[in-house]
């Protein structure tokens, strides 16, 4: 017997299906379900009187033949699509995306549920891959709590704590600091990787940091990013299959942007602060977006351009870079980096896919818990100001959503050689997943899974009779305790360090994973974010021209995902 349900009734019971649209938080962004992997009339759902019961939606298969966990009827938002599906997790990895149930009695089942299977109800929820923040100043370990609760599950960068060097630069300098930070990584339920200091003109000081466990090297102007240092650093990276991140020379002391590009010699590099105010060659660092070997990112303090952006930047900059406002030269240095015209252009370059990644610059002018919020605020602002992208339709913003989610998931993973483990929702990858109610999308996740186990969730009073009574706030779950912590999170290192046996030598508990294929990534590999415009910046007016078009927009006076959701 067939029972017809209205779309509303179906969505309320099983979540949206093909052709249904979902608003992302309180933005003007709408996503539309492109495909539903489930079977109408055969959907599985857990609960009293529902489907996942013995002999019904649950089969008799043993643990070896069923997943450890199934997320049912979830909407997946990833760079490759926007679909409705059941997600299977086994041994900490995504095992399948498809139709869950009991294949003995149900048609089309690709994921068998058994007595060994836990269920997470995904009906009405959006699932995204855990975010990857590639611009972390490891100033305080409490950043990790904030990042994880925001939906970020991998943090890459450098530092040693609130040292003056770390306050300004993302470097973990030298083998001793590298060993200590890798040991500290064992205590946190998040994937971590550390960059060594790349500012040296001879190879050995850099090679020893890679051998100690660095996933790559960071060149920063505060340590002297000269053409000689750039050339040497990239040569070491080529020899060790690691990535180089660079914060270029704001003062143009050792040369202009053309000198830096020449020092790259066509070699792959991740350019931090390819943006309007964060640093690097003033005023035209944005030019590097047009280079095939440059993988550009920007940071969240300028995301998106608002009426308050300029006002807050000067004081932030003076503190972060150890400048003295009473010294005229220090003040001039700061003011040269803060330009409304290039900040406005940064919005548009993100929207057109010229800027491939977005990160935080945590506690060093950026906010570690706001990478995801500010990504989607930028997408909203551009939708409102520029309308639909050519790739989208009047019904949805699917392409724009895929472009923006890729900026903090798959593209950072590809850039830093970790896409074989994280960065997308695909079978075989580590099950770092973030579940969102659509009304709170991008702002407050419902639950964060690390390696297939719940790490953080919104949880009510532990003494209550049910999980939901107030106060409801983020609390660490069992994946953050005891031996489970080391088995649900990863530490990324160089292949050289892994081969040298640092895990045993340092006494590391977490599984170490070598980065790979860092040196053959190009701008063309940046998914949905591969545009390479020819950019010029007027040295007097700071106007930004890309492929002959002036890039400018007005600052936002109000944003979504803001005061509706936060008291403070």
Curated annotation (Swiss-Prot):
Binding site for Ni(2+) 2: 218, 247, 273
GO BP term (any one): urea catabolic process
The enzyme's E.C. designation: 3.5.1.5
Amino acids binding Ni(2+) 1: 135, 137, 218, 361
Named cofactor requirement(s): Ni cation
Binding site residues for substrate: 220
InterPro entries xrefs: Amidohydro-rel (IPR006680), Metal-dep_hydrolase_composite (IPR011059), Metal_Hydrolase (IPR032466), Urease_alpha_N_dom (IPR011612), Urease_alpha_subunit (IPR050112), Urease_AS (IPR017950), Urease_asu (IPR005848), Urease_asu_c (IPR017951)
PTM annotation, UniProt: Carboxylation allows a single lysine to coordinate two nickel ions.
GO cellular component terms listed in the entry, alphabetical order: cytoplasm
Main localization, broad class: cytoplasm
Domain Urease, residue spans: 130-568
EC top class, as a word: hydrolase
Pathway(s) the chain acts in: Nitrogen metabolism; urea degradation; CO(2) and NH(3) from urea (urease route): step 1/1
Cofactor binding description: Binds 2 nickel ions per subunit.
Active-site feature positions: 321
PANTHER family reported for this sequence: UREASE
NCBIfam families given in the database record: PRK13206.1, PRK13207.1, urease_alph
Protein name: Urease subunit alpha
Species: Burkholderia cenocepacia (strain HI2424)
